[in-house]
Amino acid sequence: GVARARELAKRINAPLSIVDKRRERPGEVAEMTIIGDVRGKKCIIVDDICDTAGTLCKAAEVLIENGAAEVHSYITHGVLSGPAVERISNSVMKSLVITDSIQATGPVAKASNIRIVPTAPIFAQAILNIWNGTSVSSLFETETLEPIYDGQLQRLL
């Protein structure tokens, strides 16, 4: 988690802050602490998966309480079950971006602050690159992603 966050912060030339969570028991977050200064900053939460969005929405709330100007979240796998959509819709998060690795339910697709990025274009390009014997790691560069998503990248993100 932290190594990926550090790499992302470096790529977008932004300072790194961390939301450290402590659990008393599984499924319950007892305490969240912000490591770093978020005052006046647009914060980006990055995680691999989100189910009911309780922890995600709490993290966004703690960031705002610590002076963040805005909070946006990017989650690879948006399970978004149970109360997730309602929590996200009512949260302080300005936006949540997920991929289509899990098929979106109707409420997820209709939520005004949830955007879904299709994975097919990048997977297709990865397969083509492997077939052609060219670099797959180049797919992690913005200059390579823009043409794959045909100029849609800024709208999606």
Language model: regions and residue ranges:
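PRPP-associated nucleotide enzymes
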Residues: G1-L157
